[in-house]
């Protein structure tokens, strides 16, 4: 057995040596570093590159904006789903508590007072936190207490950019301190060092200061949330999502800019005037010749449309046929977009905003992207939305705004009160009629419920839509308007108190089909 193990080890070393000696790998010498070692040497540059591309490169800007538009959209909304059985509540009591809590939370979430700076509401902070995470690699959310005159809640949050969390005074990573994050002996992150200013902010006469903030307080309350994707064991900081394709996007941007410049130059119309050498010497004075020589030397070669350009004696202009627009530009650019879309885990149709294929192909691309976005939305809800809601609920219970018996005395009861789901906008519909028909069929065969279809469509609340729909039907019937097809008018009395339909006109048919009008059916 040991002989075989030795042979395997020797064979592995031999294989490694062959690869190292191969000409194909002569320039490829990656270092085997731990997760933090890679970030230590490259993270600052990666953030700078990523931010510059997000600001100046259309492909990067579109990718980042598309993610936030679908993952967060108008906002990830709370749907309280308490454990009524654990709490000993009836369904009606649970529903009433959930509705009341959702209204109070909505009041807080829709107000800019949810922000420490009073600028962004909770849903706008979701978008900012995700965007900052995507561009910088990670982001932080500070959960602070701030009292305001006439405002019943104390919780306020603040998004902290990744660069502000760093080692104090530029200290090197050592021991348990890595890139501004302190870990305990067992490896658990327990503290972040947050700089007062962004390292790129220059304030004359002011030195930067770092404040240590524990992720959890002594009482177990959350002080700081760290939004990051862990791709390797022991990874302390996250990497920008553009990391695999930074060089590709930059080169693609340069290529597209060069093609645009070439097309503009080929479209420009300019006149070149050639002067006779003898006339140039005889007619012009020494001062004027000196001036013209100087201006000619300063010409940068830029051709403006409709411009007349004087050439010096003996000069001529020859220009090759530019061949612009380049017929090969679109196929090449599309092929490069394919590479970028793979690196971003986003279908090319979504990245390019071009649904030129068939309905089936376009829908397949949208559904493929939607699976990724659902995972990302769930991650953001678990890492940011739910922890913030739990802290808000604890504060509201402590202030007497929300009644939740046993909230602070029993962790199981507290968990039952905090149960919730988070919903956002749906992916949209390429063909609304086809997709509505499919949803109707799923409900009919029992594959899904009406509530599930509403959540998947636009993240709405079935109970709210049901109540609103019932009011609409009653009001239309009251005002003499036609009730929409497929909707039965609601009754004003319970079925048990209504008179049975008169069947005397049709004794052979005891089941009057008009009796279905007594039932409320909301499609």
Predicted regions and their residues:
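C-terminal anchoring/interaction modules
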Residues: 1-13, 364-367, 379-523
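N-terminal-proximal low-complexity accessory segments that begin disordered
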Residues: 1-90, 520-523
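Short, Φ-rich (hydrophobic/aromatic) sequence segments
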Residues: 56-86, 125-134, 242-259, 380, ...
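Structured, mid-chain assembly/scaffold modules that mediate subunit interfaces
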Residues: 70-230, 442
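Surface-exposed loop-to-helix/strand elements on domain peripheries
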Residues: 95, 116, 307-430
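Intrinsically disordered or highly flexible coil/loop and linker segments, enriched in small
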Residues: 114, 135, 139, 233, ...
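Short coil/turn segments at secondary-structure boundaries
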Residues: 120, 143-145, 262-268, 312-313, ...
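Extended, charged amphipathic alpha-helical segments
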Residues: 221-362, 494-496
């Amino acid at each position: 057995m040991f002989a075989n193990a030795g042979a395997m080890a020797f064979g592995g070393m031999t294989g490694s040596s062959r690869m190292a000696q191969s000409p194909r790998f002569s320039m490829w010498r990656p270092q085997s570093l731990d997760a933090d070692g890679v970030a230590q040497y490259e993270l600052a540059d990666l953030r700078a590159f990523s931010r510059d591309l997000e600001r100046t490169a259309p492909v990067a800007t579109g990718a980042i904006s598309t993610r936030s538009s679908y993952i967060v959209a108008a906002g990830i909304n709370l749907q309280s789903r308490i454990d009524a059985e654990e709490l000993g509540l009836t369904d009606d009591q649970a529903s009433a508590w959930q509705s009341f809590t959702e209204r109070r939370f909505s009041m807080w979430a829709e107000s800019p007072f949810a922000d420490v700076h009073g600028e962004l509401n909770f849903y706008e902070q979701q978008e900012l936190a995700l965007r900052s995470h995507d561009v910088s690699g990670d982001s932080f959310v500070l959960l602070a207490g701030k009292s305001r005159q006439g405002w019943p809640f104390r919780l306020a949050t603040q998004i902290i950019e990744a660069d502000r969390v760093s080692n104090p005074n530029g200290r090197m990573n050592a021991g348990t301190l890595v890139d501004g994050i302190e870990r305990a002996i067992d490896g658990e992150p327990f503290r972040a060092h947050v700089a007062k200013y962004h390292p790129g902010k220059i304030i004359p006469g002011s030195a930067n200061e770092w404040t240590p903030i524990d992720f959890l307080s002594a009482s177990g309350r959350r002080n700081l949330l760290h939004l990051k994707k862990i791709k390797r064991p022991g990874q302390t900081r996250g990497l920008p999502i553009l990391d695999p394709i930074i060089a590709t996007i930059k080169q693609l941007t340069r290529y597209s800019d060069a093609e645009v410049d070439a097309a503009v130059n080929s479209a420009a119309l300019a006149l070149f005037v050639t002067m006779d050498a003898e006339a140039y010497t005889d007619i012009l004075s020494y001062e004027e010749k000196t001036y013209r020589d100087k201006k000619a030397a300063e010409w940068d070669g830029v051709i403006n449309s409709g411009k007349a350009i004087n050439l010096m004696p003996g000069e001529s202009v020859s220009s090759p046929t530019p061949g612009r627009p380049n017929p090969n530009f679109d196929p090449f650019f599309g092929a490069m977009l394919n590479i970028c879309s793979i690196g971003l885990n986003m279908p090319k149709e979504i990245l390019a905003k071009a649904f030129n294929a068939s309905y089936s192909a376009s829908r397949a691309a949208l559904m493929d992207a939607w699976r990724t976005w659902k995972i990302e939305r769930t991650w953001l809800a678990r890492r940011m939305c739910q922890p913030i809601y739990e802290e808000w609920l604890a504060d509201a219970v402590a202030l007497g705004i929300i009644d939740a018996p046993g909230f602070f005395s029993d962790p199981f009861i507290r968990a039952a009160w905090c149960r919730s789901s988070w919903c956002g906008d749906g992916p949209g519909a390429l063909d609304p009629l086809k997709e509505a028909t499919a949803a109707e069929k799923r409900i009919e065969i029992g594959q899904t419920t009406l509530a599930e279809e509403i959540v998947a469509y636009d993240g709405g609340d079935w109970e709210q839509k049901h109540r609103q729909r019932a009011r609409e039907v009653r009001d239309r019937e009251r005002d003499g308007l036609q009730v929409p097809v497929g909707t039965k008018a609601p009754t004003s009395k319970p079925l048990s108190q209504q008179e049975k339909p008169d069947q005397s006109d049709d004794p052979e048919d005891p089941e009057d089909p008009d009796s279905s009008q007594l039932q409320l059916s909301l499609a």
